Regions:
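NAD(P)+-binding Rossmann beta1-loop-alpha1 motif at the extreme N-terminus of oxidoreductases
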Residues: 1-31
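Phosphate-coordination loops involved in phosphoryl transfer and adenosine-cofactor binding
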Residues: 2-4, 54, 95
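Hydrophobic Val/Ile/Leu positions in short beta-strands of Rossmann-like dinucleotide-binding domains
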Residues: 5-7, 37, 100
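Rossmann-like NAD(P)(H) cofactor-binding subdomain of soluble oxidoreductases
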Residues: 15, 19, 32-90
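Hydrophobic beta-strand scaffold residues
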Residues: 25-28, 75, 122
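Internal alpha-helical scaffold of NAD(P)-dependent oxidoreductase catalytic cores
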Residues: 90-174
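NAD(P)-dependent Rossmann-like dehydrogenase/reductase catalytic/cofactor-binding core
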Residues: 163-218
Length: 218
């Protein structure tokens, strides 16, 4: 549906997306049929205002509403539900889901077409549900880093290698997140020993452990 795309932004998302478009034979350059904003959320409105009317305009933000693309009416968004890095290329997009948002059937068709070109698995997301959706994505991805850092501190304090946590976390994912451990068993005595040890060695982590334990109880 798009033979040419102007990708604005050369960060993690923009670089991976531009590479994939080129792989699929789409011309990436100036005056494209689509202007795709791959920039920080706060920069989207000003950049959108500077784009001439006529072509489609879209962004790849997870939380930003389509009104940020005003005054354009031919607009949509495609948010790859994936964590992206500069050290890898277009293969990061393979098989990832993508939230597509549009205000008309035509806009959704164009958004879905772009997702397909990028190798993504699109699903339709209402514009007014974006913040809630993105909060869930942040919990699953960003807070996983927080959990690993906290767990690594506890292992290091105990004299155990923090890198030993990685296979454990990978297996949890491979096992479809089946809950195991003391909370799953209802072993409150072990949980209390955990809390006592954390309180002694890493008191700043006690509120985090307590909140997670409460949220994890079956």
């Amino acid at each position: 549906m798009f033979d040419s795309v102007t990708v604005i932004g050369a960060g993690r998302a923009g670089s991976a997306i531009a590479a994939r478009l080129r792989e699929r034979g789409v011309r990436v350059g100036e005056e494209g049929e689509l202007y795709l904003l791959c920039v920080p959320d706060r920069a989207i409105p000003d950049l959108a205002h500077g784009i001439p009317s006529g072509p489609w305009v879209a962004h790849v933000s997870g939380a930003t509403p389509l009104t940020a693309l005003a005054p354009h009416v031919r607009r949509f968004s495609v948010h790859p539900l994936q964590t992206l890095t500069m050290s890898r290329g277009a293969e990061q997009l393979d098989g990832a889901w993508a939230a597509v948002t549009g205000e008309s059937p035509d806009a959704l068709a164009h958004a879905t077409a772009l997702a397909d070109i990028l190798g993504l698995r699109p699903f339709v997301l209402a514009d007014d549900r974006r913040a809630l959706y993105h909060a869930g994505a942040a919990m699953a991805s960003n807070f996983l880093v927080t959990l690993l850092r906290g767990a690594a501190r506890l292992l290091a304090d105990a004299g155990a290698p923090p890198e030993a946590l990685v296979p454990l976390m990978e297996r949890t994912i491979a096992n479809d997140f089946e809950l195991t451990g003391p909370i799953a068993r209802g072993d409150t005595a072990t949980v209390e020993r955990h809390l006592a040890a954390i309180r002694s060695e890493e008191p700043a982590l006690e509120p985090l452990y307590t909140a997670l334990a409460e949220a994890t109880r079956p």
